[in-house]
Regions:
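Generic signal for short, ordered secondary-structure residues
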Residues: 5, 11-12, 94
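Short amphipathic alpha-helical segments, especially helix-boundary/capping motifs
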Residues: 3-7, 85-90
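Extended intrinsically disordered, low-complexity coil regions enriched in Ser, Thr, Gly, Ala
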Residues: 27-46, 81, 93, 107-126
Length: 146
């Protein structure tokens, strides 16, 4: 899959990146989306490094994604007993479905500070790393989550 160059924001821009749907059953949810015509990625367990260069540790969550021309719909669920999975399960206990809207920007520290200055209480910035198979070979993906 080629990357749309307009999918990445320029400095100062913020884009809608993806929506996240929380589910209990990846296969059932993924199969349903495939029947609706979406191209789904294989299941991927999430892992993260506490600091850049640290070893990756499992987060206890995973996903499948319905890929769109620009962005994607992320189908997330718990896979183990971890703090991140407990947070996801608490959201699922309220209701399964849309719980996450993710935006792309270029300066996570500035965005975090702006959210706090606006009176919100953002969680600490999380950093994720993973290897993603692409048509050009494996690529390291790094992201910050505000």
């Amino acid at each position: 899959m080629s990357v749309n160059p307009h999918q990445f924001p320029r400095p100062g821009e913020v884009f809608l990146d993806h929506a996240g749907i929380f589910v209990d059953e990846f296969e059932r949810s993924g199969s349903m989306l495939e029947r609706l015509g979406f191209t789904m990625t294989p299941f991927r367990a999430h892992s993260s490094a506490l600091r850049p260069g640290d070893p990756l540790t499992p987060l206890g969550t995973g996903n499948r994604c319905a890929m769109l021309r620009e962005g994607f719909i992320e189908v997330l669920g718990p896979t183990a007993d971890t703090p991140m999975a407990a947070q996801l399960r608490a959201s699922l206990a309220r209701y399964p479905g849309l719980h996450l809207i993710a935006f792309s920007g270029t300066d996570p520290e500035a965005r975090h500070a702006a959210l706090a200055a606006a009176g919100l209480d953002p969680a600490p910035i999380s950093r994720i790393e993973r290897t993603q198979a692409t048509s050009d070979g494996d690529q390291e993906i790094r992201a910050s989550i505000v």
